[in-house]
Amino acid sequence: MDAVEPGGRGWASMLACRLWKAISRALFAEFLATGLYVFFGVGSVMRWPTALPSVLQIAITFNLVTAMAVQVTWKASGAHANPAVTLAFLVGSHISLPRAVAYVAAQLVGATVGAALLYGVMPGDIRETLGINVVRNSVSTGQAVAVELLLTLQLVLCVFASTDSRQTSGSPATMIGISVALGHLIGIHFTGCSMNPARSFGPAIIIGKFTVHWVFWVGPLMGALLASLIYNFVLFPDTKTLAQRLAILTGTVEVGTGAGAGAEPLKKESQPGSGAVEMESV
């Protein structure tokens, strides 16, 4: 890349162009994965008068759509499709802050589009609540937050374990799908099982109902944060220095060599045994 005068407009333009080139494909992948997840997953929750959905049916559907979304978008973006997962990768120094912000934006837009499409194809008497997450009357908001925290904790731990570059066997799509199904089998009676703020956000914004919506952000994000700390600093601590973590945070270093988004790194750090997930930073 040609040199650009530091401090000038050219420098800012170069950074903006470089950032967009690095993540545009990944942003579409996150948009697509989250949209599909919401359309098919939330679609399984719709209460048809002649065939009410069972918990098992809902869990299996979320399992299958998760596995599909991960398989389809894995090589393009790392298949987060979940702001909580993106936060966990950010905290674990597997992804830069600019990429994380862009991912979350793409996920929320994808979830909204997926929910809008579902709303559009559903009959009027079926789509009234559009499968929004709600806290059961007998469950307090504190209990709901705790449940969402624990459900997301196990999901994010599974995501890290499944995508760790040191893993030589197993299918991330299969294992992450199973983890999502597990969460639904337990959590659906408490909160409808979110584990994913985007999943809750899309339907809520389409029908305009945000009752205790904060629960479905606070619980999953806290669970993701805790899972990232446990996996990256307790179970499998890596050797990254503070300087390396700051470089990753700001997007000046590439992490991993596998399922990235096609970034051309300013600098590539090799860290054998660091446990870096196969994910590129901007």
Swiss-Prot record:
<feature type="topological domain" description="Extracellular">
    <location>
        <begin position="47"/>
        <end position="54"/>
    </location>
</feature>
<dbReference type="GO" id="GO:0015112">
    <property type="term" value="F:nitrate transmembrane transporter activity"/>
</dbReference>
<dbReference type="GO" id="GO:0015706">
    <property type="term" value="P:nitrate transmembrane transport"/>
</dbReference>
<keyword id="KW-0472">Membrane</keyword>
<dbReference type="InterPro" id="IPR000425">
    <property type="entry name" value="MIP"/>
</dbReference>
<feature type="topological domain" description="Cytoplasmic">
    <location>
        <begin position="1"/>
        <end position="25"/>
    </location>
</feature>
<feature type="transmembrane region" description="Helical">
    <location>
        <begin position="55"/>
        <end position="73"/>
    </location>
</feature>
<dbReference type="GO" id="GO:0005253">
    <property type="term" value="F:monoatomic anion channel activity"/>
</dbReference>
<dbReference type="InterPro" id="IPR023254">
    <property type="entry name" value="Aquaporin_6"/>
</dbReference>
<dbReference type="GO" id="GO:0015250">
    <property type="term" value="F:water channel activity"/>
</dbReference>
<dbReference type="GO" id="GO:0061797">
    <property type="term" value="F:pH-gated chloride channel activity"/>
</dbReference>
<dbReference type="GO" id="GO:0030659">
    <property type="term" value="C:cytoplasmic vesicle membrane"/>
</dbReference>
<dbReference type="GO" id="GO:0003097">
    <property type="term" value="P:renal water transport"/>
</dbReference>
<feature type="short sequence motif" description="NPA 2">
    <location>
        <begin position="196"/>
        <end position="198"/>
    </location>
</feature>
<protein>
    <recommendedName>
        <fullName>Aquaporin-6</fullName>
    </recommendedName>
</protein>
<comment type="function">
    <text>Aquaporins form homotetrameric transmembrane channels, with each monomer independently mediating water transport across the plasma membrane along its osmotic gradient. Unlike classical aquaporins, AQP6 is an intracellular channel with selective anion permeability, particularly for nitrate, and exhibits very low water permeability. It may also facilitate the transport of gases, such as CO2 and NH4(+), as demonstrated in vitro.</text>
</comment>
<feature type="transmembrane region" description="Helical">
    <location>
        <begin position="214"/>
        <end position="234"/>
    </location>
</feature>
<feature type="topological domain" description="Extracellular">
    <location>
        <begin position="122"/>
        <end position="141"/>
    </location>
</feature>
<keyword id="KW-0968">Cytoplasmic vesicle</keyword>
<feature type="intramembrane region" description="Discontinuously helical">
    <location>
        <begin position="193"/>
        <end position="205"/>
    </location>
</feature>
<feature type="short sequence motif" description="NPA 1">
    <location>
        <begin position="82"/>
        <end position="84"/>
    </location>
</feature>
<feature type="topological domain" description="Cytoplasmic">
    <location>
        <begin position="89"/>
        <end position="99"/>
    </location>
</feature>
<comment type="subunit">
    <text>Homotetramer; each monomer provides an independent solute pore.</text>
</comment>
<feature type="transmembrane region" description="Helical">
    <location>
        <begin position="100"/>
        <end position="121"/>
    </location>
</feature>
<feature type="topological domain" description="Extracellular">
    <location>
        <begin position="206"/>
        <end position="213"/>
    </location>
</feature>
<dbReference type="InterPro" id="IPR023271">
    <property type="entry name" value="Aquaporin-like"/>
</dbReference>
<feature type="topological domain" description="Cytoplasmic">
    <location>
        <begin position="74"/>
        <end position="78"/>
    </location>
</feature>
<keyword id="KW-0813">Transport</keyword>
<feature type="topological domain" description="Cytoplasmic">
    <location>
        <begin position="235"/>
        <end position="282"/>
    </location>
</feature>
<dbReference type="GO" id="GO:0008519">
    <property type="term" value="F:ammonium channel activity"/>
</dbReference>
<feature type="transmembrane region" description="Helical">
    <location>
        <begin position="169"/>
        <end position="188"/>
    </location>
</feature>
<feature type="intramembrane region" description="Discontinuously helical">
    <location>
        <begin position="79"/>
        <end position="88"/>
    </location>
</feature>
<feature type="topological domain" description="Cytoplasmic">
    <location>
        <begin position="163"/>
        <end position="168"/>
    </location>
</feature>
<feature type="topological domain" description="Extracellular">
    <location>
        <begin position="189"/>
        <end position="192"/>
    </location>
</feature>
<dbReference type="InterPro" id="IPR034294">
    <property type="entry name" value="Aquaporin_transptr"/>
</dbReference>
<dbReference type="GO" id="GO:0042476">
    <property type="term" value="P:odontogenesis"/>
</dbReference>
<keyword id="KW-1133">Transmembrane helix</keyword>
<keyword id="KW-0812">Transmembrane</keyword>
<feature type="region of interest" description="Disordered">
    <location>
        <begin position="260"/>
        <end position="282"/>
    </location>
</feature>
<dbReference type="Pfam" id="PF00230">
    <property type="entry name" value="MIP"/>
</dbReference>
<keyword id="KW-0677">Repeat</keyword>
<dbReference type="InterPro" id="IPR022357">
    <property type="entry name" value="MIP_CS"/>
</dbReference>
